[in-house]
Amino acid sequence: RCVQTAHFMKEARGKLPEDAADNDNFRVLRYVAKITINPAIAHGVAHVIGSVEAGKMADLVLWAPEFFGAKPKMIIKGGVINYTVMGDPNASLPTCQPLMYRRSFGALGGANGQTCATFVSKTSFNNGIKERYGLEKQVIAVENCRAISKADMVRNSYAPVIQVNPETFAVTIDGVHLTVPPAKECKLNQMYFFS
């Protein structure tokens, strides 16, 4: 939905002022931040996950370019392949049909506990919740999730004045009346998902 929204807003509202004439890199980074680092900041776990940086968990999603935003090729959790597209597990080659999403090395056995984390309050962490409950996953205390605001969000800190007229339901942002027509098409839809 995030990629669909990014495309729809570009069609409805035009290019962002920060984007170059020949690309939408800022828009892409902005919408990627909405589903990666910004939720991590809001939930107090950005010191561990949410971006690719030294010292953080190696959580990555790899995409074939033609399926970006729709169907990931591989999900790497804690530096180990956790979920991937694989063929028949009894076959001698990994690409034998039918290709399906399957759990991989990082999601099996004891690896799951080593590549994942359970986030708890600092009080729970200090009271030894991991030992008390016998948890196998890493237990990490959340940090700074009460004193954050929109200004702390990455590439999404704009906080306009939003007003809704109670009689006409007209929405204005910074005094500008906004209307967006219904979508006529949605990217990454039926072409990628059969139902």
What function would you assign to each model-found segment?
Residues R1-E66, P72-G78, N82-G87:
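His/Asp/Glu-enriched, well-ordered alpha-helical/loop segment
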Residues F67-A70, M86-V171, V176-S195:
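Non-catalytic terminal accessory/regulatory regions of metabolic enzymes
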